[in-house]
Amino acid sequence: MRRAAFLTSAAGFVVAPRIAHAQSATIRAGSAPVESYALMYFAREQGFFKAAGLDVQIQSFSGGGSVLAALAGGSLDVVCANVGALSNAHSRKIPLSVIAPGGGYSASSPTTVLAIAKTSSLASAKDLNGKTVAVSTLKDLQQASVMRWVDTNGGDAKTLRFIEMPVPEMSPAIQAGRIDAATLLEPSLTAERDNVKVLTDCYDAIAKQFFITLHAGANPWLERNPDVAKRFAAVLRQTADWASKNPAATGEILGKITKIPPANIARMARTAWYPNLDPKLIQPVIDATAHYKFLASDFRAQDLFWAQARA
């Protein structure tokens, strides 16, 4: 894609020709080398940030809690974090605001499933009653999705035992019989296809489409740097639009930042990219996590947004 075209099509902000003459700015950012968190990596590798006069210094984090702690502590300006973690932070009055889209889920390309052993006799939500299920983070989106699927399909989610486990350990634990099921994410899902089977596409219980991750800024930083924040958000919206149309190019970048084998990337279910901060793609996650008391209270998705990001 030609960068000139990128610059002149930024929705909501006039990016060119102002960007070409805008004062350069450095942004301290936190994310993770995982596809649903990869929008900033895409923008960096494509030169979109540079073209917008932004030096975005991305630090990699392995967990949502640690990256949000760094944001709240002032060592980061912006982060990419999952909607559940951002919602929890909002409910705890951490001063942050959502400014740009992140990675999304689409039922047409399920990137997270509830997996069981190849030899398992589990066949329904009711069969899962009383069983042990592993998730990568307790009391978050994955757990809420399994509980909602069980409750809406004849089972009783209150009987399930959830444990926290790193995704790479899930398939071996399923095969060894240490757990009954696990929320298996890409790229592990593709890598372990021969060792497990899918019980259900559990994220469909949340919605057919929704945001998994979003980009947020620290409120003090946003107040001091509104113009920089607008430029950053404009780049990410356009990067999401670019990513939605260029799966081969994003796959190449994904291989570079994650070391996932190209053959696996070609077979993987891929992250969906939605360029606009649509509250309807965020509210289902808030509602599900609040329903299971993972949040202090339910609230409107718009309450997460930076004032200048609200429609």
Predicted regions and their residues:
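Short, glycine-/small- and polar/acidic-enriched structural segments
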Residues: 22-153, 164, 180, 186, ...
